[in-house]
Amino acid sequence: MTFEDTDFRQETLDLDNPFDVRLVKDFLLELGFEFDPSEVECTMIVYNLKGDIVGTGSHLGRILKYVAVAPKFRDTTAFALIVTYMTEKLLKIYKHTFVFTRPENSVRFVGLGFTEIATAEPLYSLLEFGFESIFNYQDYLKTILASVKTAEVASMVVNCNPFTNGHKYLIEKAASENEIVYLFVVEEDLSAFPFAVRWELIRKGICHLNNVIMVRGGMYIVSGSIFPAYFLKNENVSDVMQKQAELDVKIFANYVVPVLGIKKRYVGTEYFCKTTEAYNYAMKTILPSFGVEVIEVTRKAIGTGQDNSPDFISASKVREAIKADKLDDVLALLPDSTRDFLYSDASEEIRLKIKEGKGRH
């Protein structure tokens, strides 16, 4: 869509230009948004013919962000023009696009053809638009659906950054207690260890388990921590984190569980990460009403620490050891597949990235 034959014109901002960044930051601040240029790839701004700022829109990957229109222009076509322009731009690159917004605003996107996937009242709604949808992910799940004789169908979602003996222990336990285990591997490539590497380390590490089916997480089995929160600046951080987890778990419950007939979801007891702790709480709150039992397994430990408390295995300890160049100190935490990879030249780039402080869990 172009802005020809309208009362508006649009410009793409230079995010390396402090003036341009200040322009959109000041505009959004008046509307209650805190603009962070590091969280977007492209930003456009719309003016009327008098040069007044009408609205703005940005994107990060396939996610629309910072879509906002000044109050006095909200009865115009400005919102529709911005969303349509940005969506058409993204659909030239991706097969579909997402937007996160407050539930009370979702109707405006629905009116432009977006479909609501899930809502976590009162903070989040997730909508999508494009040539593909969550139903395509369900079609993929149907291709890996296993034939089972019992209701012992379990699931687990892992990131494995990297794959540790803690992950292996949890997967082996689930496999020993169920007919089938669907192991979802988070696919978003924001971790220090890329998806392809994590997938291969897991595959090699559990090749002895014939009843575990590895599943690509796609764009729907993700980490809620990537969900934007720029429109929630006045909300309590813990509330935002909890609603991010709730939104993610609702997607799993509504779209994944019915396709695969999942009856259990295994999780490790969380002692370190507030995000994972929020996820575990959301699962315990939501999944039982969908017929899914949440089984929390005590995290595997290797001896005790200096204070005689259990020395739990965690991927973060492995990354910390890599950063400190003390990989030999954490060998007991690693299965053969991960250990062999980390001592190979193939891991050099990843180890360097961790030492430079890049990548997250």
PLM features per residue range, with description:
Residues 1-35:
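Short amphipathic alpha-helix that is part of the acyltransferase structural core
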Residues 41, 64, 151:
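Short coil/loop residues immediately preceding or within conserved phosphate-binding loops
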Residues 41-42, 94, 178, 262:
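Short, well-ordered alpha-helix to beta-strand connector turns
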Residues 45, 51-68:
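Conserved beta-strand in the GNAT
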Residues 67-76:
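A short, internal acetyl-CoA/4′-phosphopantetheine-binding micro-motif in the GNAT/acyltransferase core
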Residues 75-88, 166-172:
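Conserved acetyl-CoA-binding loop-helix of GNAT-fold acetyltransferases
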Residues 89-103:
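Conserved GNAT acetyl-CoA-binding A-motif
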Residues 101, 105-114, 118-361:
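Nucleotidyltransferase catalytic core that binds NTPs
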